[in-house]
Amino acid sequence: MPSITVRRLYQENQQKLNLTWVAGTGGSDNVIGNDDQRPTLALVGHLNFIHPNRVQVLGLAEVDYLNKLEQSAAKTALDQLFHKSMSVVMVANGQPVPRLLRDYCHSHNVPLMCSTLESPYLMDVLRIYLARALAVSTVLHGVFLDVFEIGVLIMGDSAMGKSELALELISRGHGMVADDAVELYRIGPDTLEGRCPPLLRDFLEVRGLGILNIRTIFGETAVRPKKVLKLIIHLVKANDQAMQALDRLNIQSETQDIIGVTVRKVVLPVAAGRNLAVLVEAAVRNYILQLRGIDSTREFIERHTNFLRDQENAPDID
């Protein structure tokens, strides 16, 4: 299962959450991860002595409760708490950290952090961050683009012209997310977010031209940091076998399953003289119309059916 360390959580959220590392630096490699019994949303929560969260957050009420406990009762409660598995403790609302809590975090190598943010907002941000950081992921070969604000993944065998097609679409004003290796993360039950590996960011490899820096050539608006995948364009060679298997009316929409998420798929035969960039734009426009309930294929079938019915019911003229 995916996991991250407390060090990474701190580094990526220090400024956003106004975090200060107070104690327990020896636990910087403590792991935060999912398991079958504890989904992502249950990893973060207010102080819980019975079923501690991986990320324990202390708000106004929790700190006030600890401060009001007698020394012996506080030690008993913290002994019970630190006997369980925790990754990090955070004190919210800019409150002073109870001395006893600081000592326990230091002795048990549990990172203790402070934030000036209110505890409900702090937990919301952490849950969203962990949902993305711990998302199930996979890597697919292709080019991921933003076409008319729709995330489009162009796939196909090697030397099918994916990069050339992407370059043409970028020159038409669309944006690139990733080339060659597309990282897909399941950030929701039916949502896949595509990103680019840091090493390949901004680069597009085109045969004959080499590696191009899209951001430098076309400007900042030509690249996107991430995009939700909505449509797959699969390029195939336009041979007799492929053309025979192709549904020309496209009555039954094709789909592809990616880590448990079903994504709409369009198969485009590649042949000399076909303007693939125009075809991709048309496929995306058609997809947008279908989202609005407008299906050109079904409209044509209904019109054809009505025409045949009218012909059958027309009176014979002798």
UniProtKB/Swiss-Prot annotation:
Q: What other remark does the UniProt record contain for this protein?
A: Both phosphorylation and phosphorolysis are carried out by the same active site and suggest a common mechanism for both reactions.
Stored HAMAP family: HPr_kinase (MF_01249)
Instruction: State what protein this is by name.
Output: HPr kinase/phosphorylase
Keyword terms, alphabetized: ATP-binding, Kinase, Magnesium, Metal-binding, Multifunctional enzyme, Nucleotide-binding, Serine/threonine-protein kinase, Transferase
What is the species of this protein?
Chromobacterium violaceum (strain ATCC 12472 / DSM 30191 / JCM 1249 / CCUG 213 / NBRC 12614 / NCIMB 9131 / NCTC 9757 / MK)
User: What NCBIfam families does this protein map onto?
Assistant: hpr-ser
Q: Tell me the subunit arrangement.
A: Homohexamer.
Active site feature: H141, K162, D180, R248
Give positions of region: Important for the catalytic mechanism of dephosphorylation.
Answer: 269-274
**UniProt record similarity statement:** Belongs to the HPrK/P family.
Molecular function GO terms recorded: ATP binding; magnesium ion binding; phosphorelay sensor kinase activity; protein serine/threonine kinase activity; protein serine/threonine/tyrosine kinase activity
* Requisite cofactors: Mg(2+)
Q: Which domain of life is it from?
A: Bacteria
**One BP term from GO:** regulation of carbohydrate metabolic process
| The record's note on its domains | The Walker A ATP-binding motif also binds Pi and PPi.
Q: Where are the transmembrane segments?
A: none
Q: Where is this region: Important for the catalytic mechanism of both phosphorylation and dephosphorylation?
A: 204-213
Q: Where does Mg(2+) bind?
A: S163, E205
Could you tell me what reaction this enzyme catalyses? [HPr protein]-L-serine + ATP = [HPr protein]-O-phospho-L-serine + ADP + H(+); [HPr protein]-O-phospho-L-serine + phosphate + H(+) = [HPr protein]-L-serine + diphosphate
**Binding residues for ATP:** G156, D157, S158, A159, M160, G161, K162, S163
Per the UniProt entry, the Enzyme Commission number(s) are: 2.7.11.-, 2.7.4.-
What does it do?
A: Catalyzes the ATP- as well as the pyrophosphate-dependent phosphorylation of a specific serine residue in HPr, a phosphocarrier protein of the phosphoenolpyruvate-dependent sugar phosphotransferase system (PTS). HprK/P also catalyzes the pyrophosphate-producing, inorganic phosphate-dependent dephosphorylation (phosphorolysis) of seryl-phosphorylated HPr (P-Ser-HPr).
